[in-house]
Regions:
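Catalytic machinery of carbohydrate-active enzymes
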Residues: 1-135
Length: 135
């Protein structure tokens, strides 16, 4: 695989640390550096600055807005994902405003954590867990 895009909607530094084994494993398994798309508030560039599994970290705004503004943000996020023509896109969150752009993206393979077969229905069996524990 040439391009692997990993999108994290997690807001905390602790969530980034919990994702380290996943990111390192992807890098070692596919022998390619990852492109990380991360919520700008979690400081991923600072947390991962000494890691070698990524090629680039793109920060995005994952703030909740009004419905009209959210639709515009979803379109912007879809364009951002499509810009990288990834072979594999992994979304570590099941937030609808992140799931929709991933589903409609031009990525060849898509993995979204915490969804059932039809993407509008979320898997709520692990709702008592934090985002990090779900990974």
């Amino acid at each position: 695989m040439n391009n692997i895009l990993v999108i994290t909607g997690a807001r905390g530094i602790g969530d980034l640390i919990y994702q380290l084994p996943l990111l390192r494993s992807l890098y070692l398994t596919y022998k390619t550096k990852l492109i990380l798309v991360s919520n700008k508030v979690n400081k991923a560039k600072d947390v991962y600055k000494h890691e070698d599994f990524y090629d680039e970290i793109i920060e995005f705004d994952h703030t909740r807005y009004s419905t009209i503004k959210t639709i515009g943000k979803i379109k912007y996020f879809l364009d951002l994902i499509n810009r990288y023509n990834s072979d594999l896109t992994i979304l570590t969150s099941n937030t609808t405003r992140l799931m929709l752009p991933v589903y409609f993206s031009n990525s060849k393979n898509k993995i979204i954590f915490g969804t059932k077969k039809f993407f509008i229905f979320k898997d709520k069996t692990n709702n008592y867990l934090t985002s990090s524990e779900k990974i």
